[in-house]
UniProtKB/Swiss-Prot annotation:
A motif (RxLR-dEER) lies at residues 52-71. InterPro entries: RXLR. This is RxLR effector protein 4. It comes from the Eukaryota. The keyword Secreted applies. Residues 43-65 are annotated as: Disordered.
Length: 134
């Protein structure tokens, strides 16, 4: 492994000395050796790390307020239901209020399809869910 490294270093040194010898003027060889560091400096200067923003902040769009967007977070499902009730979206609030029942019915349906429970057990569980939800 070391011999491979030494061969690579020797090839790099030989290639550099051959490129320097190819120039007739000594200033030209200095130009070649300065090309890479200046290029690296230019690349670093042009790739300034800029802070990225997800939303545009144009002063022309002053009419868009944060209240117009759905940025608010709610702590619980009860807060979401209350907020929907306030906005006269009773049907959506009803769906969210019955989300547990809907989930239980879906789980029971999957269990019935896979054969883990019988039709009688499924019917009994649905009847029990309807009694508890009233």
């Amino acid at each position: 492994m070391r011999s491979l490294f030494y061969i690579a270093v020797a090839v790099a040194v030989f290639a550099r000395s051959s490129a320097v010898a190819a120039f007739t003027n000594a200033d030209d060889s200095q130009l070649l050796s300065k090309t890479t560091p200046d290029f690296a400096t230019d690349a670093m200067a042009s790739s300034d790390s800029r802070k990225r923003f997800l939303r545009a902040t144009d002063p022309e769009d002053g009419d868009l307020q944060a209240d117009d967007e759905e940025r608010t977070k709610f702590k619980s499902l009860a807060d979401i239901i209350k907020h929907l009730d306030d906005q006269d979206m009773k049907h959506v609030a009803g769906i969210l209020a019955n989300m547990d029942d809907i989930h239980h019915k879906n789980v029971l349906a999957k269990a019935l399809e896979s054969g883990r429970i019988t039709q009688k057990n499924y019917d009994d569980a649905i009847a029990a869910l309807q009694r508890t939800s009233k």
